[in-house]
A protein has these predicted regions:
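Conformationally flexible catalytic loops at phosphate/diphosphate-handling active centers
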Residues: 1-6
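Structural motif
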Residues: 10, 73, 186, 240-242, ...
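Glycine-rich, anion-gripping cofactor-binding loops and their flanking helix/strand elements
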Residues: 12-109, 207-237, 251-258, 322
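Short beta-strand segments
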Residues: 14-16, 76-78, 100-101, 190, ...
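Redox- and metal-dependent alpha/beta enzyme cores, enriched for Fe-S-associated oxidoreductases
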Residues: 15-50, 171, 181-185, 195-201, ...
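Terminal amphipathic helices with adjacent charged low-complexity linkers/tails
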Residues: 97-140
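Active-site diphosphate/adenylate-binding microenvironment
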Residues: 143-238, 339
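Thiamine diphosphate
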Residues: 200-349
Length: 349
């Protein structure tokens, strides 16, 4: 059992990409301590009354800066890597940061962790672990203040029937929520903008949190479809796998959908959010320092490939919904065989 390292009561629980059991522990700790929960989509922790939506956006706003300035401790599980505002929070040297990990080693990117606590299978009891670490519950007003601050953020735009990247990602996420479907498909997320859209907007689950799969780390978008294919071939419950990726992620790994004539067809549906290139770069500094034409050519890099034609050439059935209602109808069906849903979400023609 880890040793205690005393700290204040106004804490935050941050859960990044991790194993399902460690994610559940993070959620249980947040609920036991009444601390706000900042959980990435692949954490397995994104659920319950402590979980915040749009937390990274809040941290970058004045209200979030004021609240995080009042925090007395941060508890980290897994490897948060999706947003700059969370990275900045974990780089603070004035805030005690404790890490709970199931592995013998944990990379402290900012060099600010006060302690790293390795927990074994017998240390997954949240009240016992909290006591061992000297973690004190916060007053209910602490988490309530964070929820009020999130509610005070400007409302995200409503897409209506238009196919927007945010709306498509949320629809796919909802279709794979085990609380909404008796046999929900497993979910694989593209590692560029798709996972970040869901990190910002996916609502916390009321019951067990969805646990999507995503490639993290140096691989970037490479191999995402191979990962989805492997998950589909390994699946045993027959619900299939649904992947949601951008057009560049699809094109980088499209040949993974090919198979030999004697190989089994996977139950895999790939939803391609085609927004004409790499949208993630528009969220960084590059557009402000170069001409739009240069930025579009070298960073957004829209492609001339025929996504639907390529998918058909690889043996996939293709559908192309034109509205959100049509997309939801496609997503309401079971995942059987190999299919690609090509969603034109801006600029793809």
């Amino acid at each position: 059992m880890p040793r205690s390292s005393r700290g204040g009561a106004r804490g935050l629980v941050v859960v990044g990409d991790t194993t399902d059991d460690l994610g559940r522990l993070g959620r249980a700790l947040a609920e036991h301590l009444d601390w706000p929960l900042l959980a990435e989509p692949t954490s397995g922790a994104r659920g319950g009354p402590q979980a915040l939506v749009r937390y990274a956006e809040l941290l970058g706003a004045p209200a979030g800066a004021e609240l995080s300035g009042r925090a007395q401790r941060v508890l980290v599980l897994g490897r948060p890597s999706l947003t700059r505002s969370v990275t900045a929070l974990l780089a603070r040297s004035d805030l005690p940061i404790d890490v709970v990990t199931a592995t013998a080693r944990w990379t402290d990117v900012a060099g600010t962790a006060a302690a790293v606590h390795a927990v074994g299978p017998g240390d997954r009891d949240a009240p016992g672990l909290a006591a061992a670490l000297g973690l004190e519950p916060a007053p209910p007003s602490w988490t309530a203040a964070w929820h009020r601050a999130v509610d005070g953020l400007p409302d995200p735009p409503e897409g209506g029937e238009a196919l927007t990247p945010d709306g498509v990602a949320l629809a796919v996420y909802a279709s794979c929520d085990p609380a909404r479907a008796e046999r929900a498909p497993d979910l694989v997320l593209g590692s560029s903008m798709t996972i970040r859209r869901l990190d910002r907007l996916a609502p916390p689950a009321c019951g067990p949190a969805p646990a999507p799969i995503a490639n993290r780390g140096l691989a970037g978008i490479d191999g995402t479809l191979a990962t989805a294919l492997g998950a589909a071939l390994a699946q045993e419950d027959g619900a299939g796998v649904r992947a949601v990726v951008g057009d560049l992620t699809f094109l980088h790994d499209a040949m993974s959908l090919g198979r030999g004539r004697h190989e089994a067809e996977p139950d895999l549906q790939v939803v391609v959010v085609d927004d004409a290139g790499g949208a993630i770069f528009s969220t960084l500094e590059y557009p402000a320092v170069m001409a739009p034409r240069v930025f579009d050519r070298y960073f957004t890099a829209p492609q001339g490939a025929d996504v639907a034609g390529l998918a058909r050439a690889l043996g996939a059935r293709v559908s192309r919904p034109r509205t959100m209602s049509e997309l939801r109808h496609v997503l309401a069906g079971p995942v059987r065989g190999l299919s690609v849903v090509h969603v034109c979400a801006g600029g793809c023609g």
